[in-house]
Amino acid sequence: MNTIHLEIVTPEGLIFSNDAKMVVLPGSEGEFGVLPGHASLVSLLKIGVVDIENVDGTHDAVAIDWGYVKIDENKVIVLVDGAVYVAGNSESEIAQSIENAKTLVKRMSDGNGILATALARIENAARAR
């Protein structure tokens, strides 16, 4: 099976690193998906949620603020100022990561539309777990 390697990096360090079937990113001009073999490009990212379709078909989510993405045929590197991986081994850990993600998005958002969209994506990602 073809996969693409995704890394999400902040000034604090590596937030996420794994192979995926597909990655959906919040580009400055709208969301876009990346599959293995994608054309190389560099793009600006806005506040939102990176949706990751894992090799086993499950989905992960990482809330991000602004940054950049560099895409090659088999690798996606996301460089952002802040990110929160929405995950956990218990309900309380997942709830805490959701709150952290909401705080990140609210801190960086300057528009109610962007805020509402990002918060809805975070909630949906958490429900899918």
Curated annotation (Swiss-Prot):
Compartment(s): Cell inner membrane
Chief location bin: membrane
Coiled-coil regions listed: none
InterPro entries, per the entry: ATP_synth_F1_dsu/esu, ATP_synth_F1_dsu/esu_N, ATPsynth_dsu/esu_N
Entry GO terms, CC: plasma membrane; proton-transporting ATP synthase complex
Signal peptide: none
A Pfam family of this chain: ATP-synt_DE_N
Topology of the protein relative to the lipid bilayer: Peripheral membrane protein
Keyword terms, alphabetized: ATP synthesis, Cell inner membrane, Cell membrane, CF(1), Hydrogen ion transport, Ion transport, Membrane, Transport
A Gene Ontology molecular function term of the record: proton-transporting ATP synthase activity, rotational mechanism
The family this protein is said to belong to: Belongs to the ATPase epsilon chain family.
Function: Produces ATP from ADP in the presence of a proton gradient across the membrane.
Database matches in PANTHER family: ATP SYNTHASE DELTA/EPSILON CHAIN, ATP SYNTHASE EPSILON CHAIN, CHLOROPLASTIC
Assembly and interaction partners: F-type ATPases have 2 components, CF(1) - the catalytic core - and CF(0) - the membrane proton channel. CF(1) has five subunits: alpha(3), beta(3), gamma(1), delta(1), epsilon(1). CF(0) has three main subunits: a, b and c.
Protein name: ATP synthase epsilon chain
Native source organism of the sequence: Campylobacter fetus subsp. fetus (strain 82-40)
The organism's taxonomic lineage, starting at the top: Bacteria, Pseudomonadati, Campylobacterota, Epsilonproteobacteria, Campylobacterales
